Amino acid sequence: MGPEGDLVAARLARGCRCFAVWMDGQVAGYGWLSTGPEWIGELQLEITPGSAEGYVWNCVTVDAHRRKGIFRSLLIGISEIARRDGLKRLWIGSVAIPAEKAVGSSGFQPALHFTTVTVGGLHAMRMTARDPKLSQDAGRVLRVQPGWYLRRSRRRRH
């Protein structure tokens, strides 16, 4: 089940939903959708989606299926189901260039840009706004505003 297999039951118990793309009888990719607080390890921040909002996270494409549009298909599927279930906005982050291309072509718009580095137990982060209205809303769910941040690095498994 992979390195995070032991976390699946806890995620499902707190209301997270897991989605998968299947090809030839095997999982080609998967991702999670949460409407409650979640830890974003790359940013060292917690996101708390608002009412009728969700957070798409921990999306993975199996190596053998990379560059086949799996991630984009996953995002479109999650978005359609979330909309059907009454969610009005989804938040997602990306730390990889190929993923960023899929995020944009799946209907997501950039709100914030992050530059981060972790060295010697410290986490430095610079956050800049991409869209004034979206960045204000993103700051609300992340409880931060554009600028520089320096904090102790924290590792959390969730």
Predicted regions and their residues:
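Conserved acyl-donor/pantetheine-binding loop and adjacent beta-alpha core of acyl/acetyltransferases
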Residues: 5-58
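Conserved glycine-rich acetyl-CoA-binding loop
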Residues: 62-73, 85, 101
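Non-catalytic positions within long, well-ordered alpha-helices that form the structural scaffold/packing
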Residues: 80-83, 104
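Conserved GNAT acetyl-CoA-binding A-motif
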Residues: 82-95
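Conserved active-site alpha-helix within GNAT-family acetyltransferase domains
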Residues: 96-114
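Conserved catalytic-core motifs of GNAT/GCN5-like acyltransferases
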Residues: 109-126
